[in-house]
Amino acid sequence: MEAKIEKISELSKLLSVKTRMSDDLFHLFGKFGIGHLLSRLSLEKRDGVSASELILSLCLFRIVGESIHRICKHKIYELSNYGKNCFYRMMIRPQMDWRRLMNHFALRYMCLLRKYGEAPLSDTTTCFIIDDTVLEKSGVRMEGISRVFDHMKGRCVLGYKLLLCAFFDGKTTIPFDFSLHQEKGKQGNCGLTRQQLKKAYHTKRNTGNPDYKRFQECKMSKIEVAMDMDGRWGYMRSM
C-alpha cells in the first residue's frame, strides 16, 4: 500500500520553515477542536496559561524530537515562551483525562477524513490492533515502576509496559486508547528491592479523578484492560 506522499509532504514543508512552523502547526491542530474538549473538562487555563496551547506545544515537541527542558532553555523554533514548569504541571494534573483526549483526537480525525472525502469505502476490511511495548525508564523512584521483560533485548529492564489499542480503517492505523502497566514478577516485588519499593513515589488520590483509574489499571493485567478497551470502543467497528 502506497502512502499519499503529496499530502504528507505538506507537514514536512511546515517543519522546514522554522520561523512559521509554530503558527502553521497550531492552525493545523486547531481543526481538532481541543479547546472545546478542555473547556468541558474545566481545564481551560492554569496559572493564566491556555491548556490547549500547552498540550499542542507538547505535541510539537514530539514532532521536532526535542525535550521540554531543551525547548524551554534554548527557545528552539520559538515554540513556547512559557517556563518548563507549566508543562510539567499540566502533565501531572490529576484531573487531566489523557484517554479522553486521545479518543477525541481519533474521532475528530475520522470526521475530518469523511469531510475531505478520504474515508475508507464501506466494504473495506477494518480491525482493532492491541499491542504492548516497553517504555524504558531510569528513575527507580517513579510511581508504579517495575522491571518488565523486553523481548527485543531478551532481558528485563526498568520501566513500564504500554498497552495501545488502535483502529485500522484500511488505510491508516489510528491509536485511540492506552494504559500503562507494571509487572509484579515471580516474587511479587516488581523486580525491586525492599528499599527501592519503600522510596518509590506514593500519593493519595481522589477516586473521582482520571489519575486514580490510571493507577488502578497499572496494577491490572493487560488482558483485563484490553477487554475493557474493546467494551468501550467496540462501536468503532461500524464506523
Predicted regions and their residues:
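Conserved, well-structured functional cores that handle cations and Mg-NTP chemistry
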Residues: M1-M239
